[in-house]
Structure formats: structure tokens, C-alpha cells
């Protein structure tokens, strides 16, 4: 079975449609039941409302290890799509808790539960801004661990 974190978000909800169209068995992590309605709308957009009922929903949070451990039961593969996106400096503590500690929790659960494959979905925004002489960021862009976005 595949676990999708961030299943109620933009990428996670579209990923759910794709996985279910491929007849995968999917467990989806959610924090708020009202967000599940948004996922229904994504399935309706693709005319796949019948597939929506095949989702195994589990309430949890990547920052809450006990709820993650419950979510990881009977899982073989994980798509980690959960993250907080904000460019507001006042959100730094919450960004670190969710995006760094939460991701570490997911990775540790993958190790503890013997997960076969983890796919971490992220954003190019995590790499920061290009340097003055660069116009784009690519796989060849130099990674500088001293940059603020690198931790």
C-alpha cells in the first residue's frame, strides 16, 4: 500500500487521482476533515469521483510521531508531499517544524517500517534565489550549505 502525506494539498490530491487510476491501494494522511472536501473537487475535475471512495483516509500529522506510526502500518511506499509554503519571515519556526522536523519524522518512519521507496516532493523555492550571474536554478546549480535555505 502507498502512503501519501500532504494528500489534501495541491500536489498530493492530484497524485491521489493518478495513483488510483493506476489501481494502486492508497492511504492518505489528513489533518482536517474539511480539507478532504477539496480533494473531492479534484477528483470531480477529472471525472473520477468513483475513485475517491477507494482512498483509505487516516488522520495524522507529520509532526506527530504516534499518528505517523499508525499511518505507516501496512505501507510499502511513501510519497511525502506535506509541507508548509510561506515566504513570511514570521513563519520561520513553523516552517522549520513542519518542513525539517516533519520530513525527518517521515524519513525515520520509513527506516523503522522498512519502506521500500520514499519519494519526497518539494519545490524549487527550497533552493532559494539564483545568484546574480544565474538566470535559473538547475540540477547543476552549486549547492552552498552556508545559505539560509540550505538547512
Question: What function would you assign to each model-found segment?
Answer:
Residues 2-24:
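N-terminal Rossmann NAD(P)H-binding glycine-rich loop of SDR-like oxidoreductase domains
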Residues 5, 29, 78-82, 118-124:
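SDR active-site strand-loop-helix element
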Residues 14-15, 38, 89-90, 129-131:
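Short glycine-/acidic-enriched loop or helix-start segments at secondary-structure transitions
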Residues 17-21, 41, 108-112:
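Short, well-ordered alpha-helices that flank and scaffold nucleotide-derived cofactor binding pockets
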Residues 25, 92-93, 97-151:
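Conserved Rossmann-fold NAD(P)-dependent oxidoreductase catalytic core, especially the SDR/UDP-sugar
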Residues 30-50:
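Glycine-rich phosphate-binding loop and adjoining beta1-alpha1-beta2 segment
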Residues 44-98:
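NAD(P)H-binding glycine-rich loop region in Rossmannoid oxidoreductase-like domains
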